[in-house]
From Swiss-Prot:
NCBIfam families: ATCase_reg (TIGR00240). GO terms for cellular component: aspartate carbamoyltransferase complex. Gene3D superfamilies: Aspartate carbamoyltransferase regulatory subunit, C-terminal domain, Aspartate carbamoyltransferase regulatory subunit, N-terminal domain. The keyword Zinc applies. The gene is pyrI. This is Aspartate carbamoyltransferase regulatory chain. Involved in allosteric regulation of aspartate carbamoyltransferase. Pfam families: PyrI, PyrI_C. Belongs to the PyrI family. Binds 1 zinc ion per subunit. Its cofactor is Zn(2+).
Length: 153
């Protein structure tokens, strides 16, 4: 039995991150510090998706997603979409693209890396390795899987 009833309330203005893999929504909330915002944030976990799987969803009112946030989001949820909402209507829809690099977001997992002892910001080059996302540290030059780098988020 299919229902067209919305399971997560509509927002007037802001953005919606849709098609987040189940379980990644919490990481995105932490990464974007959405638990600290004064704006209304509506979250849905394990919602049914059209393909029969489940997904997470995040709606943020009266806020715009930044390019930096979109790049970070592409690492955690590369197949997610970002919908821009104005006056309760979707005015723009963006698919995500992996950035070439990401800076000052994730710590280097290598405990011997200079980023842990010197006043430098972390910096990773993004690479696809055998169909998986890899992040190469600018300083120690070690490459890590996306899962290892984002595990502490």
């Amino acid at each position: 039995m299919k229902s067209n009833h919305m399971q997560v309330e509509a927002i007037c203005n802001g953005y919606v991150i849709d098609h987040i893999p189940s379980g990644q929504g919490v990481k995105i909330l932490r990464l974007f510090s959405l638990t600290d915002t004064k704006q209304r944030v509506t979250v849905g976990f394990n919602l049914p998706s059209h393909d029969g799987t489940t997904k997470d969803l995040i709606k943020v009112e009266n806020t715009e997603i930044t390019k930096s946030q979109a790049n970070q989001l592409a690492l955690l949820a590369p197949n997610a979409t970002v919908n821009i909402i104005e006056n309760f209507k979707v005015t723009d829809k963006h698919s995500l693209a992996l950035p070439k690099e990401v800076e000052n977001v994730f710590p280097c997992p290598n405990s011997n890396c200079i980023t842990h002892g010197e006043p430098v910001i972390s910096s990773f080059t993004i690479k696809m390795i055998k169909g998986n996302i890899g992040l190469k540290c600018k300083y120690c030059e070690k490459t890590f899987s996306k899962e290892i780098v984002t595990a502490q988020v």
